[in-house]
Amino acid sequence: MSDLIQKAQKVKEASKKLMNLSESQKNLALSCISKKILDNMEYILVENKKDMENAQNKGIKGALLDRLKLTEDRIRQICKGIEDVIKLPDPVGEVISMWKRPNGLIIGQKRVPIGAIGIIYEARPNVTVDAAVLCLKAGNSVLLRGGSEAINSNVALVKTMKEGLIEAGIDEGSIEIVEDTSRETAVAMMKLNEYLDLLIPRGGANLIKTVVQNATVPVIETGVGNCHVFVDESADFEMAEKIVINAKTQRPGVCNAAEKLLVHKNIAESFLPMIVKKLMTKGVEIRGCSKTVEICKQNGIEVKEATEDDWYTEYLDLIIGVKVVDSIDAAIEHINKYGSKHSEAIVTRDYFNAQKFLDFVDAAACYVNASTRFTDGFEFGFGAEIGISTQKLHARGPMGLKELTTIKYIILGSGQVRE
């Protein structure tokens, strides 16, 4: 516990120095970090191999194991992400608006760093770098606490990034990692109001729930993605098939993958057998409503019947829940009841249904005729993201650099006093 406090203190002190660094100083630090990661690739891969072996021994497999894995190509992609962040404009110091009051006061809003940010996340080593790099570019220090599955990889990455900070002449306390991965230490971190200005959890529903229930530090919820694709009665079948297959199978272990497929009843008998067969050839397990099970059975396809819990579940695996709905209104009602307010898609040729979906679905990102897989900082043009916020306060959707800043009011006077 004392180690946690010491690291939190370092992060807090570093945040005071980072807030006034120039864009060129921060970019130099990021460039040094990228170079050090490439230089230390062999060391990082050796440490990642330890994590992979430990995970396999614990029975972790499939998409969850893939999230943990680092390769030379993935490390180069991480470094490319750093270079992309370097190219992004620094939001710190941006004057958002300015106005003059009748009494002569000039009032302005400008962007400033949030300060010291804590990130609690699960088995994805790339988050270690993404989070640190984005926080640093926005003038924030960061205290990282990853999952036990990736501890060797995460420690190796943080040690390497610290080398980059030292080379750039930046306080190495700007990036710290909590090496104790126990639940008790994580909960203690959630209560470090004295040192942390913000806490961002990245992971599954249980992690998010634990943080929200225990944290006294302000929290931005991210990540849980019970995402739907609704195939409307006017949908182009070829387009719908492409979108559903991509949204479910391209990378099933991420939060913007589709977990549920809703199909309008008027096309269910023609569309469902086709899409179910395609999904099954991709290794996807189907969990259907009673109508889905009936239609599939009539076409010689056996599928498992979904339970009520299935409609709430983020699988993060090659599993999809399928439901036949009576109308677009029923689809919207289902999404708003069971969804996680992350990313939702409609496939339709009906302009008015598309507009209704966009207006009435409560989610951070709503799509018309496109895969949910695009809800991502890179795809939105933000560079790397810190997470995808599913709440409505401060930030919503992919969180880039601007979402890691806050507003300061600047008031310029010439001796005014309030009457």
From Swiss-Prot:
Catalytic activity: L-glutamate 5-semialdehyde + phosphate + NADP(+) = L-glutamyl 5-phosphate + NADPH + H(+)
CDD domains: ALDH_F18-19_ProA-GPR
GO biological process: L-proline biosynthetic process
Keywords recorded for this protein, A-Z: Amino-acid biosynthesis, Cytoplasm, NADP, Oxidoreductase, Proline biosynthesis
InterPro entries, A to Z: Ald_DH/histidinol_DH, Ald_DH_C, Ald_DH_N, Aldehyde_DH_dom, G-glutamylP_reductase_CS, Glu-5-SA_DH, GPR_dom
GO cellular component, one term: cytoplasm
Coarse class of the protein's main subcellular location: cytoplasm
Superkingdom of the source species: Bacteria
Protein name per its UniProtKB record: Gamma-glutamyl phosphate reductase
UniProt source species: Caldicellulosiruptor saccharolyticus (strain ATCC 43494 / DSM 8903 / Tp8T 6331)
